[in-house]
Amino acid sequence: MDALDFATERLGLGISTADRDRALQGWLEVRPYPEVPSTLDVLAGQGRRCAILSNGSPYMLHAALASAGLARRFQTVLSVDAIRTFKPHPRVYQMAVDALATPPGELLFISSNGWDAAGARAFGLPVAWVNRTRAPVERLGVSPDVILADLSTLPALLTAKPR
């Protein structure tokens, strides 16, 4: 909400309350990409734990997961609200390591955002970048460990990795 207000003010865009509310509602009502539910189910069948680490608020995250029909597929949902620091600050990624009680090298951080992937990689997490648009890798000083076109190949990629 604050980011939307800041961006519209900075760009000198007049935005009505109705348009603002409609834009914010878009974050609460999302549809997953077609392969996401089945991929999450396969990962669960492999005994994998799935978690979300987001700059979003707990309310936004739970509403979005519910609208997407994905809430039951995530065992852990972490919001930066708990530490009042945003990604890509290292404290955020440490929060995930602590909450999951798993060493960084045994996690896989998956993101479609280059800056988010770079922050996680700089922290020391293995990273898969989901590059649905075939965009060039951003020049952020670190690169993802693997680049995926979508999530459908993730279970096969992980079969050789320990749980």
Model-flagged regions — what are they?
Residues 1-21:
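A metal-dependent, Asp-based hydrolase signature
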Residues 22-29:
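Surface-exposed cleft-lining segments at the edges of enzyme active sites
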Residues 29-30, 86:
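Transmembrane alpha-helical core positions of polytopic small-molecule transporters
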Residues 31-38:
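A short, well-structured juxtamembrane/interface segment
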Residues 41-44, 48, 53, 57-58, ...:
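Asp-based, Mg2+/Mn2+-dependent phosphohydrolase catalytic module
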